[in-house]
Amino acid sequence: KTITFPAELKVADKHSTGGVGDKISLMLAPIAASLGLTIPMISGRGLGHTGGTLDKLESIPGFRTQFSIEEFRKLVLEHNCALAGQSKDLVPADQKIYALRDVTATVESPGLITASILSKKIAEGAKHLIIDLKIGSGAFMPDREKAKELAELLISTGERFGLKVKVAFTNMNSPLGLAVGNGLEMIEAIEYLKGNPLKDTKILTSELTAQLLVSTNLAETAEQAIAMIEEAVKNGKALKKLEEIIVAQGGNPKVIDDYGLLSTTKYKLPILSPASGYVSHIDCRAIGYALIHINAGRMKVTDSIDHSTGALLIPKIGDFLEKDEPIGEVHCNDQIKGEEVVKLIQKAYTLSSEPIAEEPIIFDIV
């Protein structure tokens, strides 16, 4: 089954290949919808070291992500946006193929990745798509060559189905933003929409949203699009849109001002820098896996998660750290496991005595 929308609507979406601390959809969807785009976003859950948009949204009390095709379409038409999980009648084969890929060592097959991403987007009725293709220690694409091959396949396959695809190659060598973990990332997204963005998430959210505004002719240039995006945050339209989506999907809108509803844990354990030096490498994958010990993520699809747990992590590649300087904190409900996670996160940072260049957030857009 596929969903169709009236031809005059500018139906667009974004897909990320998955990373650590990647809460971009939570800002992009309300911003884009507040600027006149129609966003029928079908998202996934977290698995392994990567987080999932649905889990982040479900940290909002009452927020529903499962709808019939009819309900989903109605929500999108009424609010310009809905964020939901796959339903049984939409791309039913994808879940079966995914389970097979898992046990046949073909999770990284470019053809199967393309089929999985695009089948959802074609089925949900999108006509314009920006793909955030992550490269680095927290991505499943370790290098640019493999990423390029996948990008070409996504663009050419999309074209055959009337889907205009742009691909951004982005940096996943440092966790994105500050928060990693569901409720904590939701808080960070709300703060962004209140006009308090962090540098890396601002660059990424603005650029990806701008690509959609230009692709749909709502903006003539990326510069004009970015000005529109900044205005939507400044005048509160984007935050209002998020609140509208929360209410429409059964969530408690009080989370916008009461963060305790999103994340309250028994313990907040400090993470101190194990040595002095410049951050030369961050094993983002190891950080993602470490947080599974406190139930911030899951190893199997059936695992349940604790939406309140996670970590706040300050350092990025190139930053200088003093020994014992606070570099973040672990939010957990089990102190012993939390202390284990602190140690694992400390190990994920490699420090060098030589200065390290800051890395770009976006390598290229094709």
Model-derived regions: residue spans:
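Glycine-rich tight-turn/loop motif centered on a GG-T
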Residues: 56-66, 100-107, 140-144
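Phosphate/diphosphate-binding glycine-rich loops and adjacent basic-rich segments that engage nucleotide
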Residues: 77-126
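Well-ordered secondary-structure scaffolds
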Residues: 4, 106-108, 113, 123, ...
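Short beta-strand segments
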Residues: 42, 76, 84-86, 117, ...
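Short acidic, glycine/serine/threonine-rich loops at helix termini
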Residues: 25, 43, 50-55, 86-88, ...
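Alpha-helix C-terminal capping segments
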Residues: 26-40, 120-125, 160-161, 215
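Active-site cofactor/substrate anionic-group-binding motifs, chiefly glycine-
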Residues: 1-43, 47
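A glycine-rich helix N-cap at a beta->alpha junction
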Residues: 56-82, 152-158, 162
